[in-house]
Every structure is written in structure tokens, then in C-alpha cells.
């Protein structure tokens, strides 16, 4: 068993290293923009390393969690409650964005003529102009082949196969012990790889931040500062208001939870992608006391169905464009937009820029709001992406704990212990989390 060492010197903590990397990245991008822009491969490389490991981690976590369960009805109950939570909370996020943008009206008075906007930069996003139907979305969850799902890193497809594999392995009972043990030990190896990758997280955060500041510049924020400020403030209201109340109602503090995942939040701030910390979040949530099967089902599903920050962004950005271009939107039109976004927001993945792509597709399909207005926010979208990703990450973490409590899959004593006393060793060595949890992991029940 891996025994965590004592507290690390502050300069060796991931928290300190990522903060330092982000600050250096901002300075480099601001004072030497060409050099900062050239750092883009560092950020891209880090995210690719993480994406490389996501599919097998989801597979191992879900299979071991489901195959080790005694009552298979719990899987269906967990999935159903998770989807119910996702739908309710993401709808609240959409409504909050719609409410705030109508109250603050950040686009009123800009009087932008859509015909004068340069739409070359958004052509790639608006060309398709077609949304998936519900049937197409459901069919897209079924992979053409299992290899294709893993090769492309399609989370929902991998999740579907993993659930089916876990059910099938459970049916074998004791005969499946050898396969179960192999997959369970493989998960240890995969999280050890995550530990290696996280050693270069500061380099990835530095490269991504240097590129963002170097390419777009801090000056690009000034003309649209009101929209930026309104969006960031709305995300804070959602996190500490909506999610804070949900957390309090379920026996934990949103402040302590944010402190517990502070390293993950900093990595997301640097990379603008909540997907970059998915493996670490799964390990941290298991360590917090949520059952492995619940973490394996809720977290990957939440990355498609519970993107709270993206939901806030979509309604705010759409109405902002209408306000800025003097395009009137009646209450009926706004409610129609809301209804469409209830569907299209579920198709955004936790990767950089996905929110802008969904917004472009939605405006192209719905009509009423000039699609050319997307050019207004293209320059600041990367900066808004950071707030989206942070809100998405916190929202999915809270969702996992809440669903775990609803289903009885949360060890509240363990949760309180870790929220009150988080150690640097746990934060920096995700593979050690599995050593702590899996020593009591059950084998498939004999049938």
C-alpha cells in the first residue's frame, strides 16, 4: 500500500506551481505576445495527454464499480436520479443567465450594425447551422465499433459500453473474478499515469495562458468589459447561491468543497478546459466518500448533461447579441430560445470552445438573432471559457456528491473528514487515492 508522505514544501505543491505558471504565462503573453502565442503547443500537448487517458479510466472505474455491486437496481436508480438532477440544475442555470442579462442589459446602447461585422472568423462555426434531433443524439451515443468509441474519446459511447461490460461481468459472478481483478489493477496503473502527467500541469497551464493573452491581449477585454463582468458575476451567483444552497441542504459547505478541489480549479483556469482534470476529479470524489460506481456514472455523464457554466453563457450571449444589434426579442422568443437551448446545451463537451460552437449552431437554426453578431464575442470567448469551465467543474462535483447522498452511496463521515482536513499528499498523488479506497473493494458477487 502506498503511504502518503508528510506535507510538501510549498514550492513543490501543485497549487503553488500552477499559480506561478499562470502568472508567468500572463506576463509573457502581455509583454511578448508573439512569443506567448508560440507557447500554444504546450497547452495543447497537456490537454492531449489527459484526453489520452480519459476513456480507459472511465471504462475501468465504471466496470469495477458496477461489477462489484450486489444490487444491480442501484445502477438504474443512480442514473435516473443523476439525469433528473442535471435537467433541473442546468435549467436553473439557463434561467439565471436569461434573468441577469435582461436585468443588466450589457448590450444595450452599442447599436452595432450586423452588416458591418467581419464574419470571416466565425464562418467555420456557422457553416453547419444544423442541430441534432433527439433521435440523432441518442443514436450518436451508440458507437459504430467499440474501438471507434475509444479511439475518438467519445465519453457517452465509452460510458455506454462500460455499463454494459460491467453488467455482463457481474452476471459471471465468481467466474469473472480474474477479469475483475485485472481491470481493477489496471485502474491503479492508469491513475499512476495521471500522476505522471500532472507533473507537467504547470507547463500546460503556462502555455495555454501565454497563448490566450498573446493572441487576444488584455486590451480585447475593454470594449466588452460589461458583458465579461456580468457573466463572471452571474457564475459566482450560481456557484455560491444556487450550488451553495444545494450543498448546504445536503450537509456540506461549498466553500470547503472548492478548497478541496483548488488544484483542479487552477489547472482548469490555466487550460480553459474542465476535461483536463476529469481523471483527478474522479479520484478526489472517490476519496471524498462517494462510491466508485456512482462517480463512474455521474461524472462522465455530467460532462455532457450538466454544464452549468455553459448554460449560463448560452442564454446570456444570445440575448447580448440581440441587445447589441438592436434586435428586439419578445418574451415568447426568449422562451423559445430557452427551450431549444435545453436540448442543444446537452451536446457541449467539457473542452475549450465547445460553448461557442453550440451557440453558433443554435442561433443558426433558431433564427431571429443575427448570427453575424457572434463576431462581437469571438475575441473574448476564450476569456469567458475559463469561467464556463470552472463553473462546469464545480457543478459536476456538487452533483456527484448530491446524487451519492440520494442513493446512499456517500460516506458522510469520510466526506466531513476530508473537507475539514485536506492534505497536500492527497491533492498531489491521485494514484494514492485508489490505494486507500480499493483495498476494501468487493469482487463480483457469486451467483
Swiss-Prot record:
GO molecular function, one term: malate:proton symporter activity
GO biological process, one term: L-aspartate transmembrane transport
Record keyword Transmembrane present: yes
Listed Pfam families: SDF
InterPro entries for this protein: C4_dicarb_transport, Na-dicarboxylate_symporter, Na-dicarboxylate_symporter_CS, Na:dicarbo_symporter_sf
Record field: transmembrane: 13-33, 49-69, 81-101, 149-169, 189-209, 227-247, 302-322, 336-356, 357-377
Compartments where located: Cell inner membrane
Record bears the keyword Cell membrane: yes
Keywords of the record: Cell inner membrane, Cell membrane, Membrane, Symport, Transmembrane, Transmembrane helix, Transport
Biased composition (Acidic residues): 425-436
Region (Disordered): 422-447
Record's bilayer topology term: Multi-pass membrane protein
Domain of life: Bacteria
GO CC terms in record: plasma membrane
Record-stated family: Belongs to the dicarboxylate/amino acid:cation symporter (DAACS) (TC 2.A.23) family.
Record-linked PANTHER family: AEROBIC C4-DICARBOXYLATE TRANSPORT PROTEIN (PTHR42865:SF1), PROTON/GLUTAMATE-ASPARTATE SYMPORTER (PTHR42865)
Role according to the record: Responsible for the transport of dicarboxylates such as succinate, fumarate, and malate from the periplasm across the membrane.
Protein name: C4-dicarboxylate transport protein
Species annotation: Leptothrix cholodnii (strain ATCC 51168 / LMG 8142 / SP-6)
